[in-house]
Structure formats: C-alpha cells, structure tokens
C-alpha cells in the first residue's frame, strides 16, 4: 500500500511539473492535444494538461537574420555573376509558420535565392552595380508577398557582393583602361582647342587694336593736314588781301608784282635745269621773252644780275633758231 501511494505521489508530482510552462519574453509555444492544434502559449506562466497536451513548436518573435550564400546568376546581357545577400525577418503568426511550411528557414533561403536570380536576370551587368538599392526594394516587396502565407514578415533585404567572373573582370579592366585613355585624350584635345582659341582671340584683339591705332593715327594726320591747309588758305587769303590793298593804293605795285613773278619763273627753270636727271621742258619762247622784257622795263638793263643776263641770252639764241 505504501509503495502504491509513493508511486502515485511521484507520478502526480511529475505530471504537475510537466504541466507548468514558463515562456520567456518575445517567445511563443504551440501546443497540440492528442495530435491537433490546441493553443498558443504566450510569455509568462502557462499550464497544460499532462499526457494530453504536448508542446510541438518553440520560436521567438524577435527579428532574425538569414545569411544567403553566394548564388550564380545570369544577367540580361548573358554575363555570369555570383551574388549573396542578407535577409532580416521575423515571425508574426506562429501557427502559420509551423503548419504552412515544413522547414521555415530552409524555405526562406530557397525563396530568396530564387528571387535574386529572377531580379538580376532582368538587369544588365552595369545596372546590377548602379541599381543595387532598386534591387533590394524589389526583393523586399516580392519576398514579403511570398512569405505572408507563412506568417513571416521580411523587414529588409541587402545584397552584399555582386562578383562577375574573372574573364568579365579582365574585360571590365580593359574597358576602364580604354575609357581612362579616352578621357585623357579628350581633355588633352580640349586643352589644345582652348589654347588655340585663346591664341586666335588674342591675335584678333591685337589686330583690332592695331587697326584702331592706325585709324586714330590716320584721323589725326588728316586733321593735321586739314588744319595745315586751313592755315595755308588763311595765310594765302591774308596775303592776297594785303596784295589787293597794295595794288589799289600804289601805282608801281603792279610792276613790282610782275617783276617778282618773272623772277620766280626764271628761278624755277634754273632749279629744274640744275638737276642731274635729264628732262624735257616745253616752254613758249614768246612768253619767256615777254616776261624778261617786262622785267627789263621795270628794273632797267643795269639792275639785272649775271644769271638773269645769261638766261636772256639763252632765250635770244633760242629765238634766233
């Protein structure tokens, strides 16, 4: 009897101990009764029916991280690359996470790999490097929709490394080298072009300044010549005015004027004749003789100098011929 009582006491104590469940914060348990879902245990103190109830799933509701291994992908322009990613997710419905999919984390990894291959296959190689943010947003949206039936919320997806094959890397290196050389050649040609333009502009400005200087000099010369002619005209006008007054007031002024004109006429011929170069002068002997005779009548024969006498003799000889 005592043995039976002891056995009952141990069994009852064990049943009571297994029926008490303490759930930590941010954790949840799923309980089945006789093979079917019964209830969900929340953080705190919970009780179950011994033997009939069984905890079948324990999981946290905190955010978790899945490290996606490198995956081979083909871009839209048929370039082979490898890409890996990190996925941040958490369970929002414990019942769906257990009953809707058999192995939740494995299913998540395979789904992410499939989505990465799908999204990268829509882009060309250059776009995969420049549109990483857009790819992350697309992956997040697609994964969130696909995992919603599993009671999972995907909070963030980050592509980490996108690595082309070695052949593609070598080709990209050659392309970048060619681009750098092209940019250097363009910069050099632009510098030479700017230098030529600056030189041409400098020459043009110099020619403009030179032309303006010549123009100003020509204007100044013309103004000086104009002023000279004006002064000469004024002097001539004043001389003519004085001469007119003299001729009108003095009876002998006309004869003096004729003498001066005749003397200048003879001096002109003497000056031309003294030149070394040969020249031909067409003169009317009658005009010369009349001029000389006018001079002779004014000053008399004795007042003529030797040069004038020589000129008269030459004219006489010319007349005789």
From Swiss-Prot:
Superkingdom classification of source: Bacteria
Membrane topology: Single-pass membrane protein
Locations listed in the record: Membrane
Keywords for the protein's UniProt record, in alphabetical order: Membrane, Transmembrane, Transmembrane helix
UniProt xrefs under SUPFAM superfamilies: Band 7/SPFH domain (SSF117892)
Cited Pfam families: Band_7 (PF01145)
UniProt cross-references to InterPro entries, sorted A to Z: Band7/mec-2_domain, Band_7, Band_7/SPFH_dom_sf, Band_7/stomatin-like_CS, Stomatin_HflK_fam
Family: Belongs to the band 7/mec-2 family.
Protein's recorded name: Uncharacterized protein slr1128
